[in-house]
Amino acid sequence: MFYFPVEYFLQVYSLPLIGEVRFQKDYFSEYPEQIRVGSDGYDGLRLRTAVSYIRKPGYYAVHYNQPGTVAIGAILRLNDGAIAVFSGEPNQSEQGILSPVYTLESNASLAVPTGLIFIRFAESVDVESQREVINQAGYEVAQSLSYAPHTAWLRAKSGKIVDAIAGISQLEAIANVKSVEPQMLMERGLR
């Protein structure tokens, strides 16, 4: 038989000291853990169902100022290379805006928020007539759609993605709003 002194056993199998335990930093704690889009119930003749995006730890996205940026080590490139998704912890020296990565609850596809929010009013309500209310909610019209004057793409006045997502409930509270959804870019899939 072979015997080990108890001291050696305790050194090998003991837990690390509290000071040595490192908790992974949550770089995106200001972002919601879940983003719920849509609603349950009837919208006209078709049934709309709610979709949930869940924040995925261990991944982050870098939003570059120009498309086509070479992103070494990226696991996914979106929007012609303007957004790159990486695994691991973000490097604070990254040249670009950092954001979290979400997964679509139903199929675990990676999704990245862009900071744009799509708003749709009742068809009788023109977005231009609601510009002041939109501004009071902390948003500005980024793009009006001439073929659908009751819809528009919005962005937070601050320009921050986190502010755009955080204010969705304020937009939903505006009278005659039918739908508010953040733009979430995902890898193109074949059907």
Segments and roles (model prediction):
Residues F2-R191:
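Primarily auto-inhibitory N-terminal propeptides
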